[in-house]
């Protein structure tokens, strides 16, 4: 939205849909817009998109224009952890952001996830010694985040432990099954 803080700081460029009735993303239009506008970052994420995103296709587009690839997985993080939804990092994305509540079933909070020692995709490897996680850490702490709440950290650890259990896969499958039932009702 144009009045948000991020809209005042950044120039967001949107891509179209194949069909307004279905709301399906037009990846060809996304490609054309990326070639035209040469974005520094492509953000893939959604709250109300009822389909799986084609992370590989988005990664191909982003790699061609040299953009950082970031996926907002807040609504589907538990489905990814449960193995029923694709992990954007496996398709070539550099960064994922998520909440720790919603489908992860933890306390309110957030995460920024990278592939470990990923290089800075905005610079040639021989021209930088800083990797992407270091750059993100420097921007987030201490300016935006500091003074951790140990009770929240402990609660998140419990939620992450639960997400590693076999029963969590059953939960993720049931979420998908329930969603499909609601969609056909």
Where do the model's predicted regions map?
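Conserved PLP-enzyme active-site core in the AAT-like
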Residues: 1-185
